[in-house]
Amino acid sequence: FASRKEEEGMDGWIRLSTPGREAMEVHLGLNLYQQICLPIQPENVYEMKKSDNVEIAQMYLSDGPNPMEQGVIFLNPEDGSYVELEGWYDTPWREQYHFVPFVNWVNAPNGLCWYDGFYHLFFQSNPFFQEWGDMYWGHAVSKDLIHWVCQPHVLEPQPELWKDSHRKGGAFSGSALVKEDGIHLFLTRHDGPLEDGDKTKE
């Protein structure tokens, strides 16, 4: 999850490279924030570089050999090292009984359901900051409603919101319907000025 400082005409970029392969580069362009997904290969060593006007709010690896049991693997944006979750959560400032996200803002739980051997919890999330903002849906799973495993984010704000700091919106409240072919999500899409009014659309 990358954000770009709001500087007129300044593009931001992230580059991921590994020996023997062409580097992968993503430009934020006019976007102030963006969820970036890049494919990597097991056993390879990667180097990440970014422009000075880009900040990484959080990073994780997903789609491992057993993603539901293992969940995502969080990385330190500063050096790419693995984050040991036991030490990360074992602090006086962290709720120890209820689910809390890895970092930053969380509010309303949504789409609580049971599917394929797991309880699924979706929740509104701002992965970039410790304050309310354009909403994503985070995702976590559990077998006992006590021990939760973080999964990749499943919904993000509309792309037109990524470049406009004077609008708000994204994936607001909703629910889930379990059917034979999977989980179907229903939600409110919100788009409007910072203060709700006649131009707010849902």
Model-found features: residue ranges?
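Carbohydrate-active catalytic/glycan-binding domains of CAZyme proteins
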Residues: 1-202
